[in-house]
Amino acid sequence: MGGTRFVGKPLVSRLLQQGHSLTLFTRGRQPVPDGVEAINGDRGDDQALDQLKGRAFDVIVDSSGRTLKDSQRVVERTGAPSHRFLYVSSAGVYAGSETWPLDEDSPLDPASRHAGKGETEQWLMREGIAFTSFRPTYIVGPGNYNPVERWFFDRITHDRPIPLPGDGTTITQVGHVEDLAEAMARSLEVDASCNRIYNCSAKKGITFQGLIEAAALACGRAPESLDLRPFDPSALDPKARKGFPLRLNHFLTDISRVERELAWTPRFDALACMANSYQRDYALAPTSAPDFSGDEALIGA
């Protein structure tokens, strides 16, 4: 489900390398690799989804489902996969905490905008459907349609002042899309990953200021040349991303389970994530007309 955009592209590439035969159900019109079957349709459209009726799959990969119903409607038509239901969840399911990093047993937030992903994981468990679920923090890398690293690159390359929440020491966590795809593909070959949930991001967190400096280095700019403008985030919803592209509280997960059970470790740290994203994405297609209007509410610029 999905497969032609951000997470899907590197995952499709790895699954093909493993020798899988793939069928993509996507509403996009982007070309698919040779030998890959494409079914076009919107997963929210019953008639479009009915194209899957009677089809049986060894593995179902759901990289685009956000609610429990999204995934249920697929399985209602195909039946449970014989090997694994591979799910892209989110570390956004976790509740706030006074202790960090968060592990996979940390409490969930029923009010989170990602709550549907947690509900889907619970449903897969209850139904006895063999599954593996991944909970990334911020996924970055080439093709990212969420304005995470691009938000910083826009301001740095246009010599704009950069809003900085508080003193810049809040810790966040990014992970490269290719690391996530590699871990997901590997999980299909590891029996121990069945019915497991994994945090999956870079190994270490990074402060807001550290991430901005990493973005500057990616752009070929000296971090000390940046015009950082602190603002008070206390009046804002800490989980909102209005004005600043990251939630305004700590956001850090423990990835030791996925490293241990999949014998896998991420190749990209935060610095490498930003450099790779700039070189393979932003430098090739800079934002044509960046919108800096949201900065005024934060720093008056």
Indicate where each model-derived feature is located:
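N-terminal Rossmann NAD(P)H-binding glycine-rich loop of SDR-like oxidoreductase domains
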Residues: M1-Q18
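Rossmann-fold cofactor-recognition segment
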Residues: G35-D46, S64-R66
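NAD(P)-cofactor binding segment of oxidoreductase domains
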Residues: R55-D105, A115-W123
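Conserved beta-loop-beta element that borders a ligand/cofactor-binding pocket
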Residues: E121-G143
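C-terminal amphipathic/interface module of NAD(P)-dependent oxidoreductases
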Residues: L246-A301
